[in-house]
Amino acid sequence: MSYNCCCGNFSSHSCEGYLCYSGYSRGGSSYPSNLVYSTEPLISQHLPAGFLSLQGLSGDLLGNP
């Protein structure tokens, strides 16, 4: 899985969890939205600006404005 190398770089559980869920979302919203809510505040503190774009994708999936 491609997210393993990313998570290895940051050694962050929030990074691993978020990227795993975001990967599933590409195949369809097959996961509860609360999983994104629980990880979203964490990744904003651990990931660089380049990865914050993933947060925007999660917002769209959740129907946030």
Swiss-Prot record:
<dbReference type="GO" id="GO:0005882">
    <property type="term" value="C:intermediate filament"/>
</dbReference>
<comment type="subunit">
    <text>Interacts with hair keratins.</text>
</comment>
<dbReference type="GO" id="GO:0005829">
    <property type="term" value="C:cytosol"/>
</dbReference>
<keyword id="KW-0677">Repeat</keyword>
<keyword id="KW-0416">Keratin</keyword>
<comment type="function">
    <text>In the hair cortex, hair keratin intermediate filaments are embedded in an interfilamentous matrix, consisting of hair keratin-associated proteins (KRTAP), which are essential for the formation of a rigid and resistant hair shaft through their extensive disulfide bond cross-linking with abundant cysteine residues of hair keratins. The matrix proteins include the high-sulfur and high-glycine-tyrosine keratins.</text>
</comment>
<dbReference type="InterPro" id="IPR007951">
    <property type="entry name" value="KRTAP_PMG"/>
</dbReference>
<dbReference type="Pfam" id="PF05287">
    <property type="entry name" value="PMG"/>
</dbReference>
<protein>
    <recommendedName>
        <fullName>Keratin-associated protein 23-1</fullName>
    </recommendedName>
</protein>
